[in-house]
Amino acid sequence: MVKFRLKALPKLGAQELMFTAESVRDSSRKARMPYTMSLRPSTPYGSKFAMGYETSQYRLQGVEDLYPEFRVQQLSASGSPLVLASGLLKYLDKFPHGCTEQLVSKVFPAMEVLFKSPALAANMDVYALFDDVMVKLRERQTLDGGFTTWSVPGAKPDAYDSVYAAHFLVKAREHDFNVPENMLKKALSYCEEQAGRSPEGPEDMVPAYAAYVLTLGGKVTTNYLLNLEEYYKANYEKSWRKSLGASFMAASYKLLQDENKARGLAGQYLPSGNLAADAANVYLMATYFPDMSENLGKKTVEVLLKPLSSGDFTTDSAAFATLALNALSREESDKDISFSGMKPAYTPFPTVDFVPQTKNLTVSSKRPFYYVAAQQGFAVGDKKTAAAEGLEVSKAFYDRDGKQVSTAKLGDELTVKVIYRGLRKESFGDVAIVDMLPGCFEAVSNSLQTDWNVAASDIREDRVVAYVTADREAHEFTYKVRVIAEGDFIVPPVYGSALYLPLVRANSASGMIKVSE
């Protein structure tokens, strides 16, 4: 046996090693064996966006130090608010998790942009995205036509996710994508079930959303709409017309060509500060009542801009914001926009690339403009200190005797214990816990042990992921690893993030583990 000691260099991605064995007595007798390995840092791929509106000038700030491989650092600007959608599409495309809503959100707005603003989707293979999502949706569709949040055997369908998926399928069929007839039929059957139930409150828009999807799919839904209106009037007379449910009903009546009913409900929505709901209303207004949305002008976009500029968006809200911006899109001349003397590319908006060393990059224009600074890639450096913003995470390694260790021997089997705790008053679900493995570890298949509040989990080649509910109590899950390499290795932090609370996130500190023979 021959041992080789290797040092990881900064270049990321696939690296090829070539091993050559040659006869000492006869140099013509030799054998060569290539071996490819993937080199990644101790930090996960991340995304950061700055979006906003300026009247004359914007100066780029907060440039991230990212590895050059797989790095995207671009600044775009335009007089059209559709430029904001270019950033949201990048965010959705690289989002690392895949519940049903997130899968649909990855492709639904991209599909709509492809058919209304095709230049914006020029670098996206929307059809390949569609095919990938359809495979997973088939796995998750239940007998009653709904869709489960995760691919977990025996799970029940989620009402909102199911109606949202049905909406996507109806629009995909409209655009001549290959939607299996039986799949769509079952999804619409589930929508009939949802449209026929009573709302659980004025904010429960799922029945109205389901009625809208059915109408969009060619069903006559007058009875559903009349029953919903009767229920709303009896229980929420003062508030229901200001809800998103009323906006969905207005759009449904418009599709049914009942102009009086449609106009009677449209335009009364009261912005709630919830970007997903506010954006859905803008999308419906711009699609079915363009004259009313045009009268609101810039105020319509302002409803979307505030949460986008503060980074307070998720996949759901980003998808509906993209749909809304796409529906509002209009042609704008961007010839007055300049970038500190740099020549922009038009993709389709004026765009320049920058690097971590970039300083004093400024966008200027004689007219007001919207801008997006997109930064995606692997951050240089380790997370040497822990962070806890609404959430705490930590991890430790244990040997077969249950003793906590920071060293190991080649061939050992260790138990990894990941602990998490919510720091908010109320519990919150849909928390992604991502534990990346040191280069010396190999996760043992089927070793993950979880409790009741883990909705789904997955052991991958280089990480373990669990989707959990967090509260004030400490919870844990464990899994086993096998030590497969000798040397000194960085222990990546464990990361936690609430998928629908963008400002709730945490990481443990990175560390080191020494492996001996």
Describe every region a protein language model picked out.
Residues 2, 6, 11-27, 31, ...:
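Long, domain-scale non-catalytic interaction/scaffolding regions in large secretory-pathway
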Residues 9-201, 207-211, 351-390:
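Extended, solvent-exposed functional surface patches
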